[in-house]
Amino acid sequence: MGWKSHGFRFKSGRKLRKKVREKGVRIRKFLQTFDVGQRVHIDIEPASQKGMPHPRFQGRTGVVIGQRGRAYLVQVRDGGKMKTLIVRPEHLKPQSG
């Protein structure tokens, strides 16, 4: 008997699920740009695994502190610590207001 894998997406099926009408990826999500200092929400796009942050950061808000290739460096508070995530633009949403 083997051991069950506890990988990156383990127990995240409900968190990464999309409703039927939301399925598919819009091209504008891949092409959106952000400025340094802009506040963004982490909204994971399950159809794209590249540059995906860990599911524990789903729904968190952070600040863009730089860019690395096509991805952005986003600083997020996790408990009492600040963490830097490397996230591609399809997993980010600008904060409105």
UniProtKB/Swiss-Prot annotation:
Gene Ontology cellular component terms for the protein in this record: ribonucleoprotein complex; ribosome
GO biological process: translation
GO molecular function: structural constituent of ribosome
Keywords carried by this UniProt record: Ribonucleoprotein, Ribosomal protein
NCBIfam families per record: PRK04306.1
Entry similarity comment: Belongs to the eukaryotic ribosomal protein eL21 family.
PANTHER family: 60S RIBOSOMAL PROTEIN L21 (PTHR20981)
The name this protein goes by in its record: Large ribosomal subunit protein eL21
Source organism per UniProt: Archaeoglobus fulgidus (strain ATCC 49558 / DSM 4304 / JCM 9628 / NBRC 100126 / VC-16)
Lineage: Archaea, Methanobacteriati, Methanobacteriota, Archaeoglobi, Archaeoglobales
Gene: rpl21e
